[in-house]
Amino acid sequence: MLPNTVEIRQSISREAIVGHETAWCISDLGAVQFRHAYDPQLLETIRRKALELKSERATRKHLDLTFITGADRFIPEIKELINDKRRLDALSSFAGVRLEPYPLSTVGSTVTFMSPSDGAVDWHCDGVPVTELIPLEISDPIIGGELEIYLGDCEVGRAKVNQRLPLPQRNILRIPHSMGYSTLGHFLGIFHRTAPIQFGNRITLVLNLRSAEKPFIDDNRLFYLAADTDQDAEWVMEMTKDVWENQLPAYRKFEAARTGVLAPAVQMPAITSPLPTVDVRTSW
């Protein structure tokens, strides 16, 4: 899937982006763009099917982005890439830790559509720990559409954007996308966006991953996921199950190794569906 000698176009560490060490991370991976060797016919099939599904499945609800959530549910060919061991091994070598596919059905893969009419993606930090961006189509010419990464603490950048203040140009790293090149980013806690596209378009396959050893390092909050997928609630139960079966045991194992205190066994509660009714407090 990926050759032994990979052409790396651009690489930057997490510490170089943020400006200091961070504890809430899976490794010091920041971002790396490399030439991939994914089957071009497979990618073309995914692109074609995504375009056929766009009017029915793509939404534009959050971060000014038009995309198909959980795209592998509708385009089974995506699963070939998600589960390819050679791909996972290669990406893990970039990250410095063993990676696994992100488990939630609505979040594991997306196909994004970016253009002047479809939007791009606004400034944000990722909820998922690691993301691979694989361009399926880039118009020629295209004006805009670069990955822009804020160099500095994400809270500083977010505060400026929330106050409608411009980010200093010296603090923005721009990485253009190219066909045949994939970008792997550990964008959890890293402020970034896609530069608005003024002319042309880009279609991108987005495959999300996490640390196999530390699946609890994750910033996806319920409200944030719901901002994209408020049309169903199945993913809420998936997330709950993953917490008890994967994240909590891994976290207790990590804490036991850190503190030397034996971790208690995880007691899996009964998880029922549908979701219970919650009374919202109206006075304080």
Where are these regions (language model features)?
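A structural signal for well-ordered alpha-helical scaffolds and beta->alpha junctions
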Residues: D84-L88, P129, F187, F199-R202
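Soluble, non-transmembrane catalytic domains of enzymes that act on hydrophobic metabolites at membranes
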Residues: L53-K54, D118, I190-A195
